[in-house]
């Protein structure tokens, strides 16, 4: 039976997990998701309303509904990656199917003078989907895992990396790898993560002490024995460079739950409020293979890190829609920051073909809860309705990612990086819908055709950035049959990102040119 140990220690700056600003940034952005009608117009719904996903852009939009409705959306994602790593190219493809959206809204007509309608609604959306985010790449690097573990080990006394406890040149206690790895969790600050990595590299032989020995013999002099224990410099035990293969397998996502209230005043003003709950559940498995020259004592190595991240958050939105003229609609929305609380666990595994073949501590490291705040945003919207037959709509959103902030003083270095690396962004969405009336007996139904474009600016200040600008196009169609509406959409977007295996030493960038494809099907029914 596999033994599991749970321990807690402080935040570590070396971690490649969501405890650095890059992954906090990932949780601060949202994918374009929602109903097929919404997606078919690239989400340009801030001044239109009357759609479940429009509520997530402008909460005033629920009072545009003429009656109670319920609807849900199923969809699929296809991600294609063209990856270049140190001159070697790879092509990946990943797919996923999911429930993208579910909503219900209840508008209530009132006879009160001036205030004509109150509306209550709920909408769920999958705002970030990690299930179609797997990728892998290979290539040749001038540095390898030997360099990586040497970086952590240098400066640590070898006596802290040995399983044996010596006294008077005699072994008085033999510990297990799990015991030592577990006990290192009591070290403060970043030392726990540093010591653990050094322990793994030393245990499997990827690094060796500069003195050349890691055990004491009874015949050693006191000076020699002390030199072995006090050694703080290490050499990598493999040849320079490596053929590398890296794979990331991730699952989960970010969900948002809108609890909505809105009202209509006279025939020209709509006001709304959203109280939003956010939930994050992500699992990451990072696998790293290396092959070295045949002249090396160690010819291959495998390093694995698994992360489990969970979080919850709260935000709110205030919105308004104004009928400026018979056809012109104007909208504005303020979206507050999202206040998140996170917890995270991870495990490590390392193996080589040398002496002790593998290091499997079988310890689940539980990090302390931490908090961060995403930036808020402002959205301005405009739409023109050509009677019942066409809509032209546009949204503009401003967000300043310098306002992303970690709440703990232990993460001040991350806040400094945010201040230096991130900046202001603009997002533009444009959509059009045309409606073709179809006479069916005495009823008139409609076939709708839709198209849209969106641009999302990179949150990074520099031109060559880990996250690039995104450009996307969408198309859609729908049909109303009495109180039933069926919609479908297809969206495609392109973006170039940079990915590093680790935050230190092995930092060569893999350039990932991604094409995201998404198709959705929405069923909506009038309740009463």
Task: For each feature predicted by the language model, list its residue ranges.
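Short, linear, compositionally biased motifs with a strong N-terminal bias
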Residues: 10-11, 66
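Outer-membrane beta-barrel translocator/receptor signature
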Residues: 48-57, 63-139, 255
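N-terminal signal peptide c-region/cleavage motif recognized by signal peptidases
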Residues: 13-15
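Asp/Glu-centered strand-loop micro-motifs enriched in Gly/Pro and often flanked by an aromatic residue
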Residues: 39-54, 91, 244-250
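Transmembrane beta-strand segments of Gram-negative outer membrane beta-barrel proteins
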Residues: 20-45, 63-80
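Positively charged n-region of N-terminal signal peptides that target proteins for export
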Residues: 1-4
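Outer-membrane beta-barrel porins/channels
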Residues: 19-33, 38, 105-528
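Short amphipathic alpha-helices and their capping/turn segments at secondary-structure boundaries
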Residues: 60-61, 265
